[in-house]
Amino acid sequence: ATVHKVGDSTGWTTLVPYDYAKWASSNKFHVGDSLLFNYNNKFHNVLQVDQEQFKSCNSSSPAASYTSGADSIPLKRPGTFYFLCGIPGHCQLGQKVEIKVDPGSSSA
């Protein structure tokens, strides 16, 4: 199984412009893999939301929230998963990512 470090060395941030959609499209996600969000938890968090909330940057009722600054999130089932930063304005700056998980497990 693969650990996918969101944003690679940049991490989960708004300090530099980062294309999280491009990062996601350049990775293959499989059941059993995990996401690692690295960030300063004074300034950011990670919320799992649905598609509508993702599109509108709505962080009012997330399915899950993570605040450790080094969050490992297992990808337990296939489908599309949506994550954003719940700090006001950050999602609008592009701090959000859509993860498409393939049904098959990775061959690692």
From Swiss-Prot:
Gene Ontology CC terms: plasma membrane
Cofactor(s) required for function per UniProt: Cu cation
Glycosylated residues (UniProt): N58
Disulfide-bond pairs as recorded: C57-C91
Residues noted as binding Cu cation in the record, renumbered to the chain: H44, C85, H90, Q95
Domain Phytocyanin: 2-103
Keyword Amino-acid biosynthesis: no
Keywords from the named record: Copper, Disulfide bond, Electron transport, Glycoprotein, Metal-binding, Transport
InterPro entries from the UniProt entry: BlueCu_1_BS, Cupredoxin, Mavicyanin, Phytocyanin-like, Phytocyanin_dom
MF GO annotations: electron transfer activity; metal ion binding
Pfam families per the UniProt record, alphabetical: Cu_bind_like
Name by which UniProt lists this protein: Mavicyanin
Organism: Cucurbita pepo (Vegetable marrow)
